[in-house]
Curated annotation (Swiss-Prot):
Feature: compositional bias, Polar residues: 301-313, 384-403, 435-446, 457-499
Subunit structure: Component of the ER-mitochondria encounter structure (ERMES) or MDM complex, composed of mmm-1, mdm10, mdm12 and mdm34.
Keyword set, alphabetical order: Lipid transport, Lipid-binding, Membrane, Mitochondrion, Mitochondrion outer membrane, Transmembrane, Transmembrane beta strand, Transport
Keyword Transmembrane tagged: yes
Protein name, per record: Mitochondrial distribution and morphology protein 34
GO molecular function: lipid binding
């Protein structure tokens, strides 16, 4: 089976090209054009070339004398070309503003002026490859359907080829536009051409162009208003009104109501602000009046809108809260808490919006405790004995007179831990003095050892330990690194031995007082513990008695009312639970006896690791 396709009649017919150009021009101007194109697109040249497309028959579905249906594979790489002419906008700002609403555009004066440039585009070197479904009928013409995108490549030449980015932009844009044209518009164009060639009777008659009905301009002066006056308030005759024109000047404008003109102007410009995306603003009423005088209640004085503003305080206020703790002073440790500073900026966020709630008027309570009083001037104490005799009085005065926001210097003897004593090199540990040692020291004071100069000793009784050891701290600055030169007893003053004996006696009295205070404290603690134990025992006895009484009452009630049906099940459950608990305890005991090493290891794992001790 052979087919003969004659390409020469199409290329030689001049009327064919004219009809094809008209159809292509209509198709190019049918769809909306981009804003950069400011004029219609005209097809100036169209040439199919001398090289026909290559057709390969893949399938024939229907074949007769007057109809044909088949699937073809088309490949075209000929010398056809197409030339288009139009005008483009060279000012991009004009293109941007023309595509945006007027109420959102900046509206420049001269920068957005139009600048149009003629453009000529030539499409050549067209390469097509596609699968085509072709249906031919003498009654219905030729129908072509592309199953895929037929355009492979295309060369675009224009008047802006010297500018690289413009050439690339045109190449990309025209290729995209031409693909849509071939897939959508080209089959319709070919169908209309086939009807003109083979079926002239089936060509649809074009609708007669409707005559453009120009709207007649309405002259408002044709029906002049009653009692018309000019700008100066003088009445006008009907003859004078007919001689006026719309562009006559202020005399013509005075014939109309200024109020109505203002309303019409506001109505015409209302679309500039009536946006659908207007945000909802609370406590705001939008009104469509042109001005304050146009309202019906214009005679009344307008209500003043309250000024809504927020005030924030930026002045900071400092408050000092002091606390006192007698127990801490009794132990010799000064209690010092950091001051609480409340700045104004910290409470600004809490104060904002306080008027929104019903409980907003409630103010924050501020309690200021003033523990400051007249500072007591403590008399200088020269000897240790005087400080020990006035220890109780000075302790109470310091706790009441000295504010806790300042450093407190206790006059009582401070207790020092033994760990700190072992670490310091300036502290000496020795046994507490007894009567024998004090007398021996008093007798040795006259010997050669008494030649050492006197050193002030500060007694600091330590915590109660098993050995009842006490620590006495000497000032390290009083001990020079080099040994002091020994002097004979004859060079020392005669009153030196008496001073040493007095100091030894005072030291012994201090130790005795401290020991007595410690014993009293221990006795008080023991008495408190005994009282607590007695109270706990009494409470336990009372609880047991109450439980016994309740059980007796329940038994009496059960005896009177008889056993309830549910009580038997409760008793059985309690007995069963007791039996199970005993069985579990017995098994745990047996398991521990079988493998005691495992349980000992598990207990050892619960012991925490030793604390870190630096070497």
């Amino acid at each position: 089976m052979a087919f003969n396709f004659n390409w020469s009649p199409l290329t030689a017919d001049a009327g064919f090209y004219e009809r094809a150009r008209d159809l292509l021009t209509t198709a190019l101007n049918k769809s909306p054009k981009p804003p950069i194109i400011v004029d219609d697109i005209f097809v100036t040249e169209l040439n199919l070339g001398s090289v026909p497309p290559d057709l390969e028959i893949l399938e024939i579905g229907d074949l007769a004398e007057d109809r044909f249906r088949g699937i073809f594979k088309m490949c075209y790489s000929g010398d056809a070309f197409l030339t288009l002419a139009t005008r483009v906008q060279a000012n991009p700002l004009n293109t941007y503003i023309s595509a945006k609403p007027s109420f959102t555009s900046p509206e420049p004066l001269t920068a957005s002026s139009s600048l149009t440039i003629p453009l000529q585009i030539t499409l050549s070197e067209i390469k097509l490859s596609a699968f085509i479904i072709l249906v031919f009928s003498k009654q219905k013409g030729l129908t072509i359907v592309f199953r895929n995108d037929p355009l492979e490549s295309l060369k675009v030449s224009s008047t802006f080829d010297s500018i690289q980015f413009v050439r690339d932009y045109l190449q990309k844009t025209i290729e995209m536009k031409l693909r849509d044209l071939i897939m959508d518009e080209l089959p319709a164009i070919i169908h209309r051409l086939s009807l003109q060639l083979w079926c002239p009777d089936q060509v649809p008659k074009e609708d007669e162009e409707a005559k453009e009905e120009s709207d007649a301009a309405i002259n408002p002066l044709a029906t002049p208003p009653l009692d018309a006056v000019d700008a100066h308030g003088h009445r006008l005759d009907p003859a004078e009104i007919s001689s006026l024109s719309l562009d006559g000047g202020p005399e013509t404008q005075s014939l109309f109501s200024q109020k109505n003109l203002e309303k019409m102007d506001a109505l015409a410009s209302a679309h500039r602000t009536s946006s659908l995306l207007t945000p909802n603003i609370l406590e705001v009423v939008f009104r469509a009046w042109a001005g304050q005088s146009d309202k019906p209640d214009a005679t009344a004085t307008p209500a003043s809108t309250p000024n809504l503003h927020r005030t924030s305080s930026y002045q900071g206020s400092v408050h000092t809260y002091t606390f006192s703790d007698n127990s801490s002073q009794a132990s010799g440790h000064a209690l010092s808490r950091p001051t609480l500073v409340s700045m104004g900026s910290a409470t600004t966020g809490l104060s904002l919006g306080s008027g929104r709630h019903s409980k907003a008027g409630r103010k924050k309570k501020m309690r200021v405790v003033n523990l400051r009083s007249k500072t007591a001037v403590s008399e200088p104490v020269s000897e240790i004995g005087s400080t020990s005799s006035q220890a109780g009085d000075s302790h109470t005065e310091a706790s009441t007179r000295t504010p806790m926001s300042e450093p407190v210097i206790p006059t009582t003897i401070r207790e020092v831990p033994e760990d700190d004593l072992a670490a310091s090199q300036s502290k000496v540990r020795f046994r507490p003095p007894t009567d024998a040692t004090t007398s021996a020291r008093a007798s040795e004071s006259s010997g050669p050892r008494a030649a050492v100069p006197s050193v002030p000793v500060t007694a600091q009784p330590s915590r109660a330990t098993s050995s009842q050891e006490h620590v006495y701290t000497r000032q390290p600055s009083m001990f020079p690194s080099s040994p002091a030169p020994q002097t004979s007893a004859q060079e020392m003053p005669p009153s030196y031995s008496s001073r040493v004996s007095e100091k030894a006696e005072s030291t012994a009295s201090i130790y005795a007082d401290a020991k007595g205070q410690q014993q009293q404290f221990q006795q008080q603690q023991q008495q408190q513990q005994q009282q607590q134990q007695q109270q706990q025992q009494q409470q336990q006895q009372q609880q047991q008695q109450q439980q016994q009484q309740q059980q007796q009452q329940q038994q009496q009630q059960w005896g009177r009312a008889g056993p309830q049906p549910d009580m038997s099940s409760v008793i059985l459950e309690q007995a069963w639970i007791t039996k199970i608990a005993g069985e579990i305890a017995r098994r745990v005991y047996d398991e521990k006896n079988r493998n005691p090493a495992f349980w000992e290891d598990s207990h050892q794992h619960d012991i925490p690791p030793p604390a870190y001790e630096p070497r």
